[in-house]
Amino acid sequence: MLDGTQDLEVARSWAAQLLKDKNPAKYYISAENFVAAFKNESTFSFVVTGEPFYGHLYGSGAYLDPRCNDIAIAAEEDFVPAGFAKRGGGFQFWEIQTEHTGAAIELLRDAHEINELIDRDAPDSSVRPGDPEEIFWGGLRNSQGQLADAAVVVKWQSGFHVLASVVTRAEDRGQGFATQLVRGISSHASLLGIDLIGLGVRPANVAAQRAYEKAGFSLIGSFTNYSRE
């Protein structure tokens, strides 16, 4: 039997109950964007506002709200909903339980320096200095004193925190900077009272996945994107 709700707290409870420790949904639904959620014994889905409606489906056969033009599906079986086509390469969602380990980072405050690194090595980054969601930027320097990598922790409307705009200087890649940076950011976030940090990663970016896993992140969801034809 399919159940539906327009109550945000009920939806959050359903997601926690059904998805357990692999629950990316909690990052995406908020009082500002939540529309509806649906569940049965083994699947969960939700709808939020977004051009005009965007949905997540968890589990094979999860309910697809007909209002959605764009969706992301996390299911063991690969299937294409009727009237939809695959879009892009999908994404993975990772999560870490923060812990104060003493791992060091530099707290970055020079927007020009951060933007220079992003423009040079990751111009498509989603977050820039001054973004209203930013909590703090962290970075590491190489032996020449150059900014080797940087990343930002942001707070989404849901109240949960996400690591974004992770960028490593091209010449400094493959030297462990990303893993060190993420460990340091996790440690500093713990001091700020941030318990969990989420992270989106492209499936093809295997090097990044390995770095995040070494730093303590766990994969909690793999999604395929679809858009209405």
Residue ranges and their predicted role:
Residues 1-24, 92, 96-125:
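Short amphipathic alpha-helix that is part of the acyltransferase structural core
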Residues 2-6, 12-70, 149-164:
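Conserved donor-binding loop and adjoining core beta-sheet/short helix segment
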Residues 43-103:
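Acyl-donor-binding surface of acyltransferase catalytic domains
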Residues 60-69, 168, 174-191, 209-214:
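Conserved acetyl-CoA-binding loop-helix of GNAT-fold acetyltransferases
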Residues 73-78, 199-209, 225-229:
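Conserved beta-strand-loop-alpha-helix junction that forms the acyl-donor binding cleft
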Residues 79, 212, 217:
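Conserved active-site tyrosine of GNAT-family acetyltransferases
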Residues 85-96, 198, 218-229:
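Conserved catalytic-core motifs of GNAT/GCN5-like acyltransferases
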Residues 126-136, 141-143, 148-169:
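A conserved beta-strand-loop-helix scaffold within acyl/acetyltransferase catalytic domains
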